[in-house]
Amino acid sequence: MAMPRFSVIVPARGVQGFLRHCLDSVLTQSFEGVELIAVDDCSDGGDGAIIDAYAAADPRVVALHLERPGGVGPARNAGVRHATGEYLLFLDGDDFLAPGALAAVDARLRAAGEPDVLLFDHDRIDVWEKRHGSADREFLEAHADTVFTAEDVPECLAVLPASWNRAVRRDLWEAHRFAFADGPYDDVPVVFGVLLAAARIACLDQVCVTWRKRRRGSASTVPGRHHFAVIGRYDALFRTLAGTGLGGGTEAARGVLFAHAARRLLRIMEDDGRVRAGDRPDFHRELARLLRRHRPAGAELPAHLNSYAVYRSMRHAGTLRHRTAKKLRARKHSTARSVYRRYYGLQLRRPIDENLVVYAAYWNRGVLCSPAAIHAKARELAPHLRGVWVVDRRHREDVPPGVEAVLVNSRRYWEVMARAKYLVNNANFSGTVHKRPEQIYVQTHHGTPLKKMGMDLRRHPAAAQGVSFLRMLDHADQWDYCLSSNPHSTEVWQRVYPSDYETLPTGYPRNDRYFATTAEDVRRIRAGLGIAPGTTAILYAPTHRDYERGFNPPLDLERLAEALGEGYQLLVRTHYFYGADSRLAALEEVGRILDVSRHPSVEDLALASDALLCDFSSLMFDYAALDRPIVVHSSDWEAYRHARGVYFDLLSGEPGDTPGHVAGDEQEIAALFHSGRWSDEHSAQLRTAFRERFCPYDDGLAAERVVRRVFLGEEDLLPVVPLTERTVAPPPHKAEPCAQA
């Protein structure tokens, strides 16, 4: 087998939301002489499974799994040890190659006579998907037709010091035994070392890689003293240059490297996302010590680099006007604050109540969904905790007896929001709530995403009307934990709500009921709804459509009820965005349907039904955990997927995409039920694949996992019960055996 031209090494840990794009960007290159070495750094997310799937599908992919987490540097080193290509390229798991990049790199390498190192251009993409050019373009353009060494052109040492903007001959790497360091800023020794060791360096003035600038969620974006490590990296680099023959011995090269180090370290110190304000004096002190120690002959340190007091006064003078304007704006707004908001400010100064948990669901609509399941389990496993629910005035009468609740924006509301140790929500608290550092916020979400969510909505204006993406990011920045019921959700949440929370693969607590309900419970729920024994109950729950005002049933419910005929009962539940509907009330009055829109528990409705008739609602993912038949109504799929955007083709008919039979109108739906196809073997096969993809963690223990991990501090999550070993609530025809005799 011929040696590949390039070995592209991709370390992966906690990047499952971006990893597929990264790997695809390599494998879809027009240039074919590539091996892709993907290294799973002992990730507890879905990175390893993604890598294995790609390796199984493409022989060019080499999957490596480290036995213990080592960080990006050791993961890259492991990849290098398995590389067989002529040139090494490195790509982070959340970055990606530009189309045609490898072909362009290959062409430039050949034109330059196979140099030791090729530097190429990059761009940067931010959370808004805005692209920014690099500061290296001018240098790369100026040297696009030359070959040089670092001593000839020392300015090459000022090119962005990253592992992913250069191709390095593997024999050079092995001859000098280069290796990435262990810990933060692992690439400093390597990126400069290869340039200083290279006998021939060339440049390519073409963007070959896009660097995804993460706002939060990676080690480089978490502030802390671990960023001090970069000073030690440069100290070691300068010491190496002084004591070895790795080139760079000329004063010009040392001067360029010195100036680069000063600029870069100062930028790191000034970055609020890296060095906290309280740590800056110490960082500056170590920075100044480094620069004094390795200052080239004749060079003088500017006053702001020699003294933190001088630096601070200069920085303060430069920002005083901005800060003054900001204070004036804040003062203007503060005059409009309510008495309760001032009361909230006072409460924020009081100690945290370590035993207080605040719950909310669906923008304060009541005791519902996964927060309700967590609350119930906390009462059982952590009775020392006191739970308080936030509700609005319309729903305060719906609070069950024995459950403590506060009205949103009341005096008590501001008190508990300021002092609770734990905050649990499936949506968002008010934007005026500011989470204290000591508080722990659990975001449960309220459904697996079929439709585009979060930052992905920017491409879908019909769905994004009234959405503040800045506020959305502010909300995500408050989360400490984000619950996930499947790897698909984990990937989506990480990408569309970019921040530094921890994702917990717990399953959805609201679905625990499906595994704790008995046949007697099923009979009781059906009787309470008025469903006659032996009746086939079909739960119809259409989703909200952003391109329509109000509830417009996609199906003619009267025609459907008539087509179904005797022995069938339609349970119709509108989306919670809508209020009471007179058309449904009229149909219910004449016995055509049961309007269950205001029923407090969608879980009860699922348990009472024999089948789900859905369109594009996330309820289908929860219902699949019950392992009961699902029929998809598809009439406006094209309009929905173009207006809202979707993550996969629900109607593809492929296992894992489609949960059951698909029908386009009322007659097709009725025909499916009359023929028995709604629950046939093909339906079961589709449902099984759908469950495997979207219900891997839903095993009845989700709420317990959350309580034990978050409230009780247990590190290890309870193991997941395999799909084949789970016992779900019996379907009605088994719960009512006599009725079917």
Walk through the language-model features, giving the residues of each.
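Donor-binding/catalytic cores of nucleotide-activated saccharide
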Residues: 93-204, 211-227
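A nucleotide-sugar donor-handling region in carbohydrate enzymes
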Residues: 337-341, 450-550, 686, 720
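Conserved catalytic-core segment of nucleotide-activated headgroup transferases in glycan assembly
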Residues: 125-127, 366-382, 495-496, 506-586, ...
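Membrane-interface aromatic/basic loop that binds lipid-linked glycans or pyrophosphate carriers
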Residues: 274-350, 376, 380, 740
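Catalytic binding pocket for nucleotide-activated donors in carbohydrate/polymer assembly enzymes
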Residues: 505, 618-694
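Short aromatic/hydrophobic "clamp" motif used to bind/position activated sugar donors
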Residues: 88
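A conserved acidic beta->alpha catalytic loop
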Residues: 40-50, 68
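Glycine-rich, basic loop-to-helix element that forms the pyrophosphate-binding segment
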Residues: 66-83, 96
